[in-house]
Amino acid sequence: MSKQPISNVRSIQANINIPMGAFRPGAGQPPRRKESTPGTAEGAPATPEEKKPVPGMKKFPGPVVNLSEIQNVKSELKYVPKGEQ
């Protein structure tokens, strides 16, 4: 059985492991962080009266629901097995 010559191109292609997008501009650098303005305090929570709608946010039909209310009610619920009813 005669051995066929191994092509260098195939051996390079088989061993290469480059992630997708590695050759894009800016690849390899971590994403830039947005710098906050020094005049705003990040730790101060805004009251509902001070909150302004976010531009580009969709307004869904129906009433606005407070998520914390739902979570509180859900935590008060208790599982009752079928035999105890």
From Swiss-Prot:
Keywords: Phosphoprotein. GO terms for cellular component: contractile muscle fiber; costamere; cytoplasm; M band; muscle tendon junction; nucleus. It holds the Pfam family Chisel. The modification Phosphothreonine is found at residue 47. Residues 19-63 are annotated as: Disordered. InterPro entries: Chisel. The keyword Amino-acid biosynthesis does not apply. It comes from the Eukaryota. The modification Phosphoserine is found at residue 36. Plays a role in the regulatory network through which muscle cells coordinate their structural and functional states during growth, adaptation, and repair. Belongs to the SMPX family. This is Small muscular protein. The lineage of its organism: Eukaryota, Metazoa, Chordata, Craniata, Vertebrata. The gene is Smpx.
